């Protein structure tokens, strides 16, 4: 049975941590975003207006390559969904940080690349797991992992950016319909440091996988 699971959620939600936990639990291959090897991301944080389109096209290419590899592996867990990159782009377009025409071009490109074609396996996941966190939890985890370009101590304006981002996530999750989905409460269930919370999260995911016939 092919089982492709993707994680989603804002910066600092714990996607990579849950990817590792879930991949070990299910005995599947884990795929990671590779933030530290992304040459565009630090540039984006310095000048979002200039680098939004470049960052999103870079990520689109990277994620499509990951999806193709994940399909070949048959069973996999990825720490970021290709669908939520458009959320960042839309937020920047709405706030005039990005050009609306660039956003439309990107969105059309994404839809064309994700379209199912005869004879090719579907690029859609079997399950999307969304980790909901509050701004407070988000900021604590961003500070803890210590990536310099993400810190509000370096750039205080990032706090407003993160707060705006959270406002886009809930509607995005509610409207997501490319696959079955489940929401994990990342505030209530600290699966990174609390083993009981981790067991509860894995139980919820296992139940969802059984419900959709993938376990």
Curated annotation (Swiss-Prot):
GO cellular component: cytoplasm
GO MF terms held by the record: ATP binding; deoxyadenosine kinase activity
Keyword set, alphabetical order: ATP-binding, Kinase, Nucleotide-binding, Transferase
EC numbers: 2.7.1.76
Domain of life: Bacteria
Any Pfam family the entry gives: dNK
InterPro entries linked: DCK/DGK, Deoxyribonucleoside_kinase, DNK_dom, P-loop_NTPase
Signal peptide stretch: none
Keyword Kinase carried by entry: yes
Active site per the UniProt annotation: 79 (proton acceptor)
Annotated substrate binding sites: 33, 45, 56, 80, 85, 150
Residues holding ATP: 9-17
Recorded family membership: Belongs to the DCK/DGK family.
Protein purpose: DGK/DAK plays an essential role in generating the deoxyribonucleotide precursors, dGTP and dATP, for DNA metabolism.
Listed name of the protein: Deoxyadenosine kinase
Record lineage: Bacteria, Bacillati, Bacillota, Bacilli, Lactobacillales
């Amino acid at each position: 049975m092919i089982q492709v699971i993707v994680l989603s959620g804002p910066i600092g939600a714990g996607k990579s941590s849950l990817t590792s936990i879930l991949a070990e639990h299910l005995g599947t291959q884990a795929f990671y975003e590779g933030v530290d090897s992304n040459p565009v991301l630090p540039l984006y944080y310095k000048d979002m207006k200039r680098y939004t389109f470049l960052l999103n096209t870079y990520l689109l290419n990277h994620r499509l390559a990951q999806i193709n590899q994940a399909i070949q592996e048959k069973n996999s867990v990825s720490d970021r969904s290709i669908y939520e990159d458009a959320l960042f782009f839309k937020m920047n377009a709405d706030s005039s940080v990005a050009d609306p025409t660039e956003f439309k071009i990107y969105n059309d490109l994404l839809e064309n690349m994700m379209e199912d074609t005869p004879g090719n396996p579907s690029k859609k996941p079997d399950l999307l797991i969304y980790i909901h966190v509050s701004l407070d939890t988000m900021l604590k985890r961003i500070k803890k992992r210590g990536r310099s370009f993400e810190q509000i101590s370096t750039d205080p304006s990032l706090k407003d950016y993160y707060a705006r981002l959270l406002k886009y996530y809930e509607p995005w999750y509610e409207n997501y319909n490319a696959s079955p989905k489940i929401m994990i409460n990342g505030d209530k269930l600290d699966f990174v440091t609390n083993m009981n919370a981790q067991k509860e999260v894995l139980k919820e995911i296992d139940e969802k996988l059984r419900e959709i016939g993938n376990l």
